[in-house]
Amino acid sequence: MANTKKTTLDITGMTCAACSNRIEKKLNKLDDVNAQVNLTTEKATVEYNPDRHDVQEFINTIQHLGYGVAVETVELDITGMTCAACSSRIEKVLNKMDGVQNATVNLTTEQAKVDYYPEETDADKLVTRIQKLGYDASIKDNNRDQTSRKAEALQHKLIKLIISAVLSLPLLMLMFVHLFNMHIPALFTNPWFQFILATPVQFIIGWQFYVGAYKNLRNGGANMDVLVAVGTSAAYFYSIYEMVRWLNGSTTQPHLYFETSAVLITLILFGKYLEARAKSQTTNALGELLSLQAKEARILKDGNEVMIPLNEVHVGDTLIVKPGEKIPVDGKIIKGMTAIDESMLTGESIPVEKNVDDTVIGSTMNKNGTITMTATKVGGDTALANIIKVVEEAQSSKAPIQRLADIISGYFVPIVVGIALLTFIVWITLVTPGTFEPALVASISVLVIACPCALGLATPTSIMVGTGRAAENGILFKGGEFVERTHQIDTIVLDKTGTITNGCPVVTDYHGDDQTLQLLATAEKDSEHPLAEAIVNYAKEKQLTLTETTTFKAVPGHGIEATIDHHHILVGNRKLMADNDISLPKHISDDLTHYERDGKTAMLIAVNYSLTGIIAVADTVKDHAKDAIKQLHDMGIEVAMLTGDNKNTAQAIAKQVGIDTVIADILPEEKAAQITKLQQQGKKVAMVGDGVNDAPALVKADIGIAIGTGTEVAIEAADITILGGDLMLIPKAIYASKATIRNIRQNLFWAFGYNIAGIPIAALGLLAPWVAGAAMALSSVSVVTNALRLKKMRLEPRRKDA
């Protein structure tokens, strides 16, 4: 091969020589490819013709065979981006680099997330490439206080704005002369006075625009800095030209536009300051999550209690937590009992009772007892750290709805410069032939009114605020893509056990005396069956003392038989009683039928061959399940239940909560196929489950929603995780998605509408440059401000007919 490139890929999933041979054979079947796969190093070295192939093709081939290619992810902090054209250009350049699988750049967070192949490139190369484009970049430091960094940057912007405003304010007086025919001191109209004030604004305060424009143009791009630099420079240097004419006596009334250039820069800085201030508020939800973390822990060392920083706690350390203190890390209680406020995770305000061997979650509040615990998860592995990670990823991700804005942003500035040039030509040749000033003013107005910033901020700011607000309510979206897809859902499939129900059987009905219950619980206490556990717990709640069984025998399909303290015990169904010649009174038979119809497991109890009781056990429906399903129906969403239980039990549960569609007798591996059937009917389906035995169905659904327990926030199969198991959060998640997408559409409508309307108005000469500059400055502020309205949204779904 004359023109060749070589790449090395890390391969995962190979177990033997057959694997490596299979991959090598498949790659070598491609034209102009020479591949060698080493099982020991788990690497594939591929020589290829870059005109015919790219690395992604080899990766797809390997993945199609069922193997993986190792990918690393790095997050980068980027400074110097001023508008969507900047972020769009950086993203485009990164995605063209060898070894980069995918790169996204977020203008709002000023961060990039890059997935890359470590054998092809590394984080330092990514940083260097961004720096060559004229921006500052560094690998994100998770230990660095991002809030204080942004506060410092905001303070710097404010200082520049104040200096610029002080210098521009006297020049602003000249505009009032033109507008209102006011009388002002002669000093204000003196060209030297205007020059002295405008020059530092143009070349010191406004130098950032020249630097940004130069860096972008040098790299073949154009951004907002180009528009500002060209527009203000045109006004400034035309004023210099007029001033020179005044100095050499060619004119006594120079037409100066120093106030235009200086006031434009001040207004744009004002807009950027307001924008940065508003953007800083979009990350409040993340800041609040970070503030929940404990700062230190009380560790037990050599019998002494010592306070240490949280980052020095290791797995296995013994910690002591006193009343009123936060649980420092995730762990297990080894001594003591208490009640813990877990509302930061579950939203449930009632403290949860905790005893020895119970799990405790870091950053929750210990209310009333001193406990000793063992650390099981620390640092980035804790539940709160996982929540923060999910929220960060969601806030830095892109929604598909942003693509159009990204495409337009890439061409926006060159098009605007072209329109400004055309405006100048039309004015100087057709509108006011031979008159320079009106043509200049109109073209400057076109340059400064155009705003690519609003386009770039329209989607990410809404995603940031929307996902942050959802996280505050225990709803974790894994990314912007899932926020967008969720609003399209028209069908929700709920797994029964652990989703609609509590997943823990309890005694719902009992008819009999305490002695019968005591004997029943004693007979069941050694069984590991969940129903037996429910009966034993019920007896303990009644404070009954359990003894020991003398004999025990399971009767397959019918029940159990036992001897306790010389009493013969039978527990089971009708058949067991009939086989032992025990007759059922009509009211007992009716109760049995009633319980079975309600989906409960009913058992008859006979002591010494005489019927003495009946007990019913069922997995109870969660609080608010019925209300949640009613809300989904009110939103026009179809709700179905999927379960492996028999149809009678399933129908009984469905009836309790108001579900019409029941899919019963389904094996776990068949759940995904049921989702596919619904999708084939043209439905957009969300699957709700616990992420364990229904993971394939969660993946298959358009949106997978996992019910987390607080410690399981990163369930891989899920697109959304609901903390705490409250089903009311499902309609809230859908409403949050709808509200966020509605907000994005409002922002995009404003951003597009503003430019579509504003540029022609400016080109017609109907706007003074300073008015156009003010409009441009406020346009991006209005987009961010509109997104911030989501911070106050009440997650209460609307009826479809409302």
Curated annotation (Swiss-Prot):
Gene3D superfamilies, alphabetized: 3.30.70.100, Calcium-transporting ATPase, cytoplasmic domain N (3.40.1110.10), Calcium-transporting ATPase, cytoplasmic transduction domain A (2.70.150.10), HAD superfamily/HAD-like (3.40.50.1000)
Q: Which GO terms describe its molecular function?
A: ATP binding; ATP hydrolysis activity; copper ion binding; P-type divalent copper transporter activity; P-type monovalent copper transporter activity
Residue ranges of the TM segments: 161-181, 192-212, 224-244, 256-276, 411-431, 438-458, 748-767, 771-790
Where is each HMA domain found? 5-70, 72-138
In which compartments does the protein localize?
A: Cell membrane
Q: Where is the active site?
A: 495
Keywords tagged on the record: ATP-binding, Cell membrane, Copper, Copper transport, Ion transport, Magnesium, Membrane, Metal-binding, Nucleotide-binding, Phosphoprotein, Repeat, Translocase, Transmembrane, Transmembrane helix, Transport
Positions with a binding annotation for Cu(+) 1: 16, 19
The intrachain disulfides are: none
Describe the task this protein carries out: Involved in copper export.
Hey, which family's this protein in? Belongs to the cation transport ATPase (P-type) (TC 3.A.3) family. Type IB subfamily.
Identify this protein by name.
Copper-exporting P-type ATPase
Could you read off the lineage of the organism from its UniProt record?
Bacteria, Bacillati, Bacillota, Bacilli, Bacillales
